[in-house]
């Protein structure tokens, strides 16, 4: 379910130092810059839906030059992030969060059994497989849910709270959805 949040991101979060892939040295605030940014919290790298999300977002960004800047968050080290993104989106920017501190600060929760492995998730595997995605080696917290936040001027202006591990918005139409919510 997507709904606007309009919440201010605390200074302590914005001023937190970050490392990862394709980042400028500094803090989370340094990565956001001006304008709209899409913060995408991925599930573990072995998850078929993590791979689907990265692939779908890459296609949406390629199709729309005005697409919001995407900043991924992932549960691994910078080395793991480089290896994953080298294959799936070499130009992507991503924050390494092996301790899942940003996940917690943004309220990206852990899944229940049904949210992680329920019927809706199992049905969604066919969708991801039809796009050429498969599960890989598990890494990180396999129960951590995904999360997506549109951020502008240090405020969350829209958020997608997934109903289950495979739930994500239509990335191609996401800029229109965010614009309507603002």
Residue ranges, per PLM feature:
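Thiol/selenol-based redox catalytic cores and closely related redox-interacting motifs
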Residues: 97-166
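Structural microenvironment flanking redox-active thiols in thiol-disulfide oxidoreductases
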Residues: 53-104
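A short beta-strand-turn-helix
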Residues: 12-37
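A short, polar/charged loop-to-alpha-helix boundary motif
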Residues: 166-181
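A generic fold-level signal
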Residues: 33-34, 65, 143
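N-terminal targeting signals for export/organelle localization
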Residues: 1-20, 181-182
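Loop/helix-junction capping segments adjacent to catalytic residues or to phosphate/diphosphate-binding pockets
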Residues: 47-48, 79, 165-168
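Short active-site neighborhood of thiol/selenol oxidoreductases, capturing the structured segment around
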Residues: 28-58, 69, 73
């Amino acid at each position: 379910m997507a709904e606007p949040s309009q919440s201010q991101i605390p200074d302590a979060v914005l001023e937190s130092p970050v490392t990862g892939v394709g980042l400028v040295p500094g803090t989370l605030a340094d990565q956001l810059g001006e304008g709209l940014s899409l913060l995408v919290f991925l599930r573990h790298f072995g998850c078929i839906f993590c791979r689907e999300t990265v692939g779908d977002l890459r296609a949406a960004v390629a199709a729309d030059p005005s697409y919001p800047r995407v900043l991924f968050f992932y549960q691994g080290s910078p080395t793991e992030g480089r290896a994953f993104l080298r294959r799936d989106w070499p130009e992507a920017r991503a924050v390494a969060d092996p301790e899942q501190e940003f996940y917690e600060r943004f309220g990206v929760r852990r899944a229940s059994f049904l949210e992680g492995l329920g019927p809706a998730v199992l049905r969604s595997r066919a969708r991801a497989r039809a796009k050429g995605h498969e599960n890989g080696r598990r890494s990180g917290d396999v129960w951590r849910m995904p999360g997506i936040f549109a951020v502008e001027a240090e405020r969350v202006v829209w958020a997608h709270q997934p109903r289950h591990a495979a739930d994500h918005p239509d990335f191609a139409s996401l800029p229109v959805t965010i614009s309507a919510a603002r």
